[in-house]
């Protein structure tokens, strides 16, 4: 699902789940997303509302695909977002860096790039 479609679904009440690692979440995220790292998803899926659609994102697409499949297998209406967080940013949609401030597109890209360079390999 493309980022603009995801935004529309979220506006209509869908849940947005970020399955990236803690350091990625800290660097920047989509405002309003719930952070459920992939390695914690099985134990924390109960935090999600089964009555509302779930859209899952990560950095590039593979983790969110796995998470969406796992959630669908557990009875959720779950869909991965195409292109991950970079596609969201490229679509000009807002990101939220640490501290709760929703950055403009260019600001968020700078934050993400700086964090990516300083992240452990």
Task: Report each predicted region and the residues it spans.
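Short, surface-exposed ligand- or partner-binding patches at beta-edge/loop junctions that are enriched
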Residues: 57
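Rhodanese-like catalytic fold shared by cysteine-dependent sulfurtransferases
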Residues: 1-15, 22-53, 64-121
């Amino acid at each position: 699902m493309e980022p603009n479609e995801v935004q529309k679904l979220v506006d209509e009440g869908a849940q947005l789940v970020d399955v990236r690692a803690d350091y990625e979440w800290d660097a920047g995220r989509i405002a309003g997303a719930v952070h459920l790292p992939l390695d914690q998803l099985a134990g924390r899926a109960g935090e999600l509302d089964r009555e509302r659609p779930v859209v899952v994102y990560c950095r590039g697409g593979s983790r969110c695909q796995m998470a969406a499949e796992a959630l669908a297998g557990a009875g959720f209406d779950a869909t991965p977002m195409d292109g991950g967080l970079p596609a969201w940013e490229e679509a000009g949609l807002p990101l939220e860096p640490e501290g709760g401030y929703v950055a403009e597109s260019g600001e968020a890209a700078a934050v993400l790039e700086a964090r990516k360079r300083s992240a452990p390999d």
